[in-house]
UniProtKB/Swiss-Prot annotation:
It comes from Pan troglodytes (Chimpanzee). Catalyzes the first step in the biosynthesis of chondroitin sulfate, heparan sulfate and dermatan sulfate proteoglycans, such as DCN. Transfers D-xylose from UDP-D-xylose to specific serine residues of the core protein. Residues 53-65 have a biased composition (Basic and acidic residues). Monomer. The gene is XYLT2. This is Xylosyltransferase 2. It is found in: Golgi apparatus membrane; Secreted.
Length: 865
């Protein structure tokens, strides 16, 4: 009783405090319930057909001079409203949910469910203990699949030889896109589970303990000192892909010497580049192209296979008596002259130069994923489970760019030593094998004392930008990639005491000025008046590849560009020449190039066969289409002065902070990203509003920009198809404008590479169901934004959904002409049209002179540059 009375007394005394505490707890509970309800609601719409469980996230970032980062993972996202901001060294700017939206669940249209993924049940063979297929019995590695996105689930159509239980292996089987790849994965996993895939122990021949890595300094005066023996000769292995033939020619021009040898492997997917390289090699006896080609994906086992096969080829070419093997990519460039490199290697002719990770081995093994089993198929590296490092050896690794002696290459290629044979088996199922195989073989061999911990390169690592898991669509791991050099990085290229002779990476589509600076530093300036020193061209389409490599958006845009240009030729011609300047396009464009000047994108160059309206043969014309800027900076406050640019596009590259889709060509099925660039200044919170062509407010969200934030970007999860036509993105603060930009969602004239049919146009050009781009409606913002009444725009949009043929082309051309203008036309051959000058005489045509990327004959000193 006494205790009860005391409790009652305490309750009466502190009843106000207790009531306040209960109220706070109740409020917190309501908030938690509200947000969990939003997540559950989204999960109910998006999660009914769940994909296989994501891979477990790893931790940490990339190792020094190694491309591996951490285990791949999609990571969990809490709802749809997490955005990203990029700001090195400062907290991430946040995208927060706008409070101006209202829920409209009653009219929500759920997306079509994805294909049913295979179950995660155990997979068993026909009988336990059935004999396993040996490694030699595997099907060949498939060339199918795409590195543009992770392979999609398919039905199980294979027969595993054992019970597969590991979660990594089951996930890989569920995601592999072909039966052949699934069978390969099952065979590898069964062999591994039986203990017959990986070597248990590997012999070590090196008698040294610890790492043998003598430091070698470099003094430029050494290049003038007499050599010990004849100057060394180098076999350059160039591993290239993509379409940047002009940058490759520029690299070859810089490193070429008639005493060296050049062997070029072009990725199997890069047919245009292969044709150009084959033509290039015909002019030089010491330049050859591999007669075979492979698909070499980032981090894949195929890269090591390609190197070993290339090394064997180089050893067996008659008359190629080389001393060193140096691998390069098209994004490399020399930082010292050939004379300096030859002098240095001649004084160290018995050394092998490989860059090590520079940290304890156990951590490197974890970061690099060496304790995990991988297999490559469908152009993807699949993580299949854990494994043990073989006993008896020291595992090393780091960079996959190296300088190796001929004797070591012969040992790796020809030896029967169990050390090499068993390590080749181990690295066949290893992520990034070229970053570790040669290091580990050398450090455990009798030649271990020849190792120098320096690969003679300087690499532009910026891990805050380069380690963003950008390869997770190719490998089940998080990887890193170096950044491109820019002029502000030039001091890093001038290593004085450390011997470095090459640098990477360089991309002329990102920055060509730094190459000009480096080239001038090495070889001096070009003669005065040399053309095209600031210009750069890169092919993006060639008719020999066929239209299959083009998206419907690009095919639509390129053909529309040709029509706009030919119309311009007729209207811009002098009156007397008008009949001679009327053309009709014939077929599809024959080629398309990106054109840059002074490191700014200048537009597309389209080469098109055109039939004159007057009598005469068809002519080949090249047309220059230039994008028109649409950014408006509207604010007058200090916060508004922070905004530098506002862009919308696709293929955003967070490492280089640019859109790889130059010009922002996008269609109804694309997923655009809005990117803002900021100067430093006071913190601010801004609202981003997207408005479609019929004045539907598609979405609205807030971004918080910290003091030192440089870039913010967010891709709203808009329902598709997007309505074709001009869109507007506004940036506001307290509903006062800071900036505005317009972008075009292009009406498509092609669908699956065929002219658009009416039944396809009726849904592809109609916008999303019920005009709802999000699960919430933002149309209540129309009055705040002072948007026009939508009725007329809606009627026009409805008419547009019925267009096909010439009427559809006219609409597409009309919309495109609001964002692009014809900047030039020229004739590749003779033309009676007086307003068309020859392309070779222009400064902008892809056929105009480009001396910096033209090779020419070998000079008296054995060089090209």
């Amino acid at each position: 009783m006494v205790a009860s009375a005391r409790v009652q007394k305490l309750v009466r005394r502190y009843k106000l405090a207790i009531a306040t505490a209960l109220a706070i707890l109740l409020l917190q509970g309501l908030v938690v319930w509200s947000f969990s309800g939003l997540e559950e609601d989204e999960a109910g719409e998006k999660g009914r057909q769940r994909k296989p469980r994501p891979l477990d996230p790893g931790e940490g970032s990339k190792d020094t001079d190694s491309s591996a980062g951490r285990r791949g993972s999609t990571g969990r996202r809490h709802g749809r409203w997490r955005g990203r901001a990029e700001s090195p060294g400062v907290p991430v700017a946040k995208v927060v949910r706008a409070v101006t939206s209202r829920q409209r669940a009653s009219r929500r249209v759920p997306p079509a469910p994805p294909p049913e993924a295979p179950g995660r049940q155990n997979l068993s063979g026909a009988a336990a203990g059935e004999a396993l297929v040996g490694a030699a019995g595997f099907p060949p590695h498939g060339d199918t699949g795409s590195v543009e996105g992770a392979p999609q689930p398919t039905d199980n159509g294979f027969t595993p030889k054992c019970e597969i239980v590991g979660k990594d292996a089951l996930s890989a089987l569920a995601r592999a896109s072909t039966k052949q790849c699934q069978q390969e994965i099952a065979n590898v996993v069964c062999l591994h589970q039986a203990g017959s895939l990986m070597p248990k122990a590997v012999p070590r021949h090196c008698q040294l303990t610890g790492k043998m890595s003598p430091g070698i300094q470099w003094d430029e005066s050494q290049a003038q000192q007499p050599m010990d023996g004849p100057p060394v000769r180098i076999a350059y292995m160039l591993v290239v892909h993509g379409r940047a033939i002009r940058q490759l020619k520029r690299l070859l021009k810089a490193v070429y010497h008639e005493q060296h040898f050049f062997y070029i492997h072009v990725d199997k997917r890069s047919n245009y580049l292969h044709r150009e390289v084959v033509e290039l090699a015909q002019g030089y006896d010491n330049v050859r192209v591999t007669p075979w080609r492979m698909v070499t994906i980032w981090g894949g086992a195929s890269l090591l296979t390609m190197y070993l096969r290339s090394m064997r080829d180089l050893l067996e070419v008659p008359g190629w008596a080389w001393d060193f093997f140096i691998n390069l990519s098209a994004t490399d460039y020399p930082t010292r002259t050939n004379e300096e490199l030859v002098a240095f290697l001649s004084k160290n002719r018995d050394k092998n130069f490989l860059k090590s990770h520079g940290r304890d081995n156990s951590r490197f093994i974890k970061k690099q994923g060496l304790d995990r089993l991988f297999h490559e198929c469908d152009s993807h590296m699949w993580r299949l489970g854990e494994r043990q490092i073989p006993a008896g050896i020291v595992v090393d690794g780091g960079s996959d760019w190296f300088v190796l002696t001929r004797s070591f290459v012969e040992y790796v290629v020809y030896t029967d030593d169990p050390l090499v044979a068993q390590l080749r088996q181990f690295y066949t199922y290893t992520l990034l094998p070229a970053e570790s195989f040669f290091h580990t073989v050398l450090e455990n061999s009798l030649a271990c004392e020849t190792l120098v911990d320096n690969n003679l390169r300087v690499t532009n690592w910026n891990r805050k930008l380069g380690c963003k898991c950008q390869y997770k669509h190719i490998v089940d791991w998080c990887g890193c990639s170096p950044n491109d050099f820019k002029p502000q990085d030039f001091l890093r290229l001038q290593q004085v005491s450390r011997p470095t002779f090459f640098a990477r990476k360089f991309e002329s589509t990102v920055n060509q000025e730094v190459l000009e600076i480096l080239d001038f530093h090495l070889y001096g300036s070009y003669p005065p008046g040399t053309p095209a020193l600031k210009a750069y061209w890169e092919n993006t389409y060639d008719a020999a590849d066929g239209p299959s490599g083009l998206s419907d958006v690009m095919l639509t845009a390129y053909t529309a560009f040709a029509r706009l240009s030919l119309h311009h030729a007729a209207t811009a011609a002098p009156p007397m020449g008008t009949p001679l300047c009327r053309f009709e396009p014939r077929g599809l464009p024959s080629s398309v190039h990106l054109y840059f000047y002074d490191d700014h994108f200048q537009g597309y160059l389209v080469t098109q066969a055109a039939q004159p309206s007057a009598q005469g043969p068809a002519e080949m014309l090249e047309m220059w289409l230039m994008p028109q800027g649409s950014l408006k900076l509207l604010g007058r406050s200090d916060q508004a002065s922070r905004l530098q640019s506002l862009e919308v596009g696709t293929d955003w590259d967070p490492k280089e902070r640019l859109f790889r889709n130059f010009g922002g060509l996008l269609g109804p099925l694309d997923e655009p990203v809005a990117v803002q660039r900021w100067a430093r200044g006071p913190n601010l919170t801004a609202t981003v509003v997207w408005i479609d062509p019929t004045y539907v407010v598609a979405t609205s969200y807030d971004i918080t920009v910290d003091t030192e934030t440089e870039v913010t970007q967010y891709k709203p999860p808009l329902s598709r198809p997007l309505r074709p036509g001009p869109w507007t993105v506004r940036l506001l603060q307290f509903w006062e404008p800071l900036g505005e930009t317009r972008f075009l969602v292009l009406p498509l004239t092609f669908n699956r590479k065929l002219p658009l049919r009416k039944d396809d146009a009726s849904w592809l050009h109609a916008g999303p169901p019920h005009n709802e781009y999000m699960e919430q409606s933002f149309q209540g913002l129309s009055s705040i934004l002072n948007l026009p009444q939508p009725e007329l725009a809606e009627e026009a949009a409805q008419r547009h959904t019925q267009l096909t043929g010439p009427a559809l082309e006219a609409w597409t051309d009309r919309e495109l002409s609001s964002f692009w203008s014809v900047a030039g036309l020229c004739a590749i051959g003779p033309s009676p049209c007086p307003s068309l000058e020859p392309c070779r005489l222009t400064s902008w045509s892809s056929l105009s002179p480009d001396p910096k990327s033209e090779l020419g004959p070998v000079k008296a000193d054995g060089r090209l540059r």
